[in-house]
Amino acid sequence: RVDRRQRQMCIRDRRINHAIFQNVEMLQANIDAVTTHIRKKLEEKGEKDIERKVLRFLPADTGKTYWHDGENYWRVMAFIPNARTYETVDPEYSYYAGVAFGNFQAMLADIPDELGETIPDFHNMEFRLKQLRDAVAADAAGRVKEVRYFLDEIERRADEMCKAERLHREGKLPKRVCHCDTKVNNMMFDENGNVLCVIDLDTVMPSFVFSDFGDFLRSGANTGLEDDKDLANVNFDMEIFKAFTKGYLESAKSFLLPIEIENLPYAAALFPYMQCVRFLADYINGDTYYKIQYPEHNLVRTKAQFKLLQSVEEHTPEMQKFIASCI
């Protein structure tokens, strides 16, 4: 599929998880469109280090950037020399993440290609609430009664948390090409600590800008663990928020609409809320989706995400004030 000379330039073959990404053709078409557009933007700017600033997937003998061996799907990506990733989430790297993901969205704001949803309804809050309500109606594991408090709290916030979908239907909020898996380790850095490019593009698809903003903060600004049993550990770290937001707005405010900017605090709350809904639905269903390490694991996760949500809500006025100072 890939000749010997090419293989010497490449990392090892990578299998595509087609259990999650069932439409591999769409998945790779999205990635090809995005990397081609970014490459064109970099060329127009006169970038001299393009091969380290955007991913490149090598074509198979079919001409496509993936192939099927009869059982699995594979692809090969060109090696990026002298590049590394970091797991650290601190204000410095959170700022870099904000710059990188904001710049990623900015470069793709005028992409002419129409991308598909590689995971349909991935960040659709109305869809996630329907899943929860269906789980409650079925009560397959007989657990609804014990989680009534969380169900009531979720429903109390449901109208507010679904406003992105409503605003989109009203024509006020656009969908844009987003990364949809914004973690600090999804960025490549050079030997001097400068950001090279955003990686792991499997989830690139149309979404609201809230996806990339809120998803990073859900994990990066959580002072505790996603499944922390001690809720005293779980709070929203405003230093991480400020660093990420500063970087994000520096690179993204040129294309963002006022309605997108003013709803960034909503985005910070949306993702712990959404994950709370998903963990709770799985607990009610009898733990059929997420891997668990003990019987109450999904309930513990639910409680931790709800505590994070409450902390985000408490910091909303401070977030609004900081965002205003960045514009």
Predicted regions and their residues:
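ATP-dependent phospho-/nucleotidyl transfer catalytic cores
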Residues: 15, 22-25, 80-95, 110-179, ...
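Single conserved hydrophobic/aromatic residue that forms the stacking wall/gate
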Residues: 1-7, 11
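Catalytic activation segment of kinase domains across protein kinase-like and atypical kinase folds
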Residues: 185-225
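Conserved ATP-binding subdomain of kinase catalytic cores across diverse folds
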Residues: 5, 16-130, 209, 225-229, ...
